[in-house]
Amino acid sequence: MSRLTTFAALAAAAVSLSACAVTNDLAKVPEPMGRFLLGHSVTVVEEPEIGPFSREATDEAWEEAINFAMEERFGRYDGDKYFHIATKVDGYALAMIGIPVVFTPKSVLVASVTLWDDEKGEPINEPEIFTVSEELSPEALIGTGLTKTADEQMLSLARSLAKSVQKYMLE
């Protein structure tokens, strides 16, 4: 993904909350996905684009947040065929403290995701690029830079990503 494309995606997502994914559905029975059983969730963070006005985050923190969110969502499935989810963080912006109503930066994550068939040992799709923003919440309206830590923002973005990946898989 080119730097220009990454920043364009970051900018587009940062100005709109309409793309927020509500992920509070984890207490419900998951929609069936055939024989799906989560094998591994692997996350790679190699020199991601960091958007303007972003808090810093370590690669390890991103890996932990995304793997947790993927396992939280996909670990509920009990099929009999293993699949792996490989995620590459392409870019992000973690909202900094802003001025409510006047300037409320939004957090955004751009990631490429590939699904792998364990039995065949090969990917079942070309990398799918996802651009997600934080879960819709009252805090998001005033700016999560004021109300959440960077770790909380990353977990929210990771959960939105996992929800978007699930939606993609169900299509």
What feature does the model see in each segment?
Residues M1-A21:
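Sec-dependent bacterial lipoprotein signal peptides
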Residues C20-E64, L170:
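A structural "domain/chain start" motif
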Residues A21-G34, L146-E171:
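Terminal low-complexity, intrinsically disordered regions
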Residues A21-R35, L109, T114-E128, E135, ...:
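Intrinsically disordered, low-complexity linear regions
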Residues I50-E56, E122-K163:
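Short secondary-structure boundary motifs at beta->alpha junctions and helix caps
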Residues E56-K81:
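N-terminal, post-signal-peptide region of Sec/Tat-exported proteins
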Residues E71-G75, L94, A162, Q166-L170:
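Sec-exported extracytoplasmic/periplasmic mature domains
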Residues R76-I124, E135-T147:
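Surface-exposed short loop/turn segments
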